[in-house]
A protein has these predicted regions:
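Hydrophobic positions on the long internal alpha-helix
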Residues: 68, 82, 108-118, 177-181
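Rossmann-fold cofactor-recognition segment
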Residues: 45-63
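Catalytic loop of short-chain dehydrogenase/reductase
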Residues: 89-91, 118-194, 199-207
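A glycine-rich helix->loop->beta "capping" turn
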Residues: 50-51, 71-83, 90-91, 117-120
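Conserved Rossmann-fold cofactor-binding substructure of NAD(P)-dependent oxidoreductases
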Residues: 60-76
Length: 207
């Protein structure tokens, strides 16, 4: 009998804490850009009784994301989703931050939403940085939430001349994460599936 599957992006300590809490009896697929990171985390968890498979997954690459989701489906129905992947403003360029933290997260939410089982749950790690920036207009928030994924990086507000530095790029990415989770929660099915953003708020309904 196949187990329910947890898709977990970003092999770090926050993701592991969540996976340990919800992963008993589940097949856990952990993806990270650096396979050795995923392998290290999988080893730690497997040694204490979890069932974890490490894979390489690049959050900036849609093909890699699709392969990650497909790999999870080979083990069973995807019932849970953890997105703890991303880069920080001290690690990466403006372009990379927007490609990974903003675009990649939007793709991952969209693709997991297409296949997650009824009653499935998901969590995306965000940041207070999304609120530590100048106020966006309602129209700008709506664009971050609802623009087709492949058009997100073409938005005027995300063009190089409108992004001051890596911190600003990170703030915009995290603001987009929040709005995208709200948008995808509706598509996932508010009364049957549940998505939340950390820290702070949650959207959807646990019933």
């Amino acid at each position: 009998m196949k187990k329910d599957v947890i898709l977990w992006a970003g092999a770090g300590q926050i993701g592991m804490a969540i996976a340990r809490r919800i992963g008993t009896g589940k097949k856990i697929i952990v993806g990270d850009k650096k396979l050795e990171n995923a392998e290290s985390i999988a080893k730690i968890m497997n040694e204490v009784g979890f069932d974890v498979v490490p894979v390489q997954m690049d959050l900036s690459d849609k093909t890699s994301i699709l392969k990650f989701v497909e790999t999870g489906q080979t083990y069973g129905e995807v019932a849970m989703f953890i997105n703890a992947a991303g880069v920080s403003p001290s690690q990466a360029s403006v372009e990379t931050i927007l490609k990974v933290d903003l675009y990649g997260t939007a793709v991952l939410l969209e693709e997991v939403g297409k296949i997650i089982k009824e009653g499935g749950v998901g969590v995306t790690i965000s940041s207070q940085s999304g609120h530590r920036m100048p106020q966006l207009t309602a129209e700008e928030d709506e664009m971050l939430a609802c623009t087709p994924t492949e058009e997100l990086l073409s938005l005027e507000m995300l063009q190089p001349e409108n992004i001051k530095d890596t911190l600003h790029a990170y703030q915009m990415a995290k603001r987009c994460n929040e709005k995208r989770v709200m948008y995808e929660a509706v598509k996932w099915g508010i009364l049957q599936k549940y998505v939340c953003k950390m820290p702070g708020r949650q959207t959807g309904n646990s019933r």
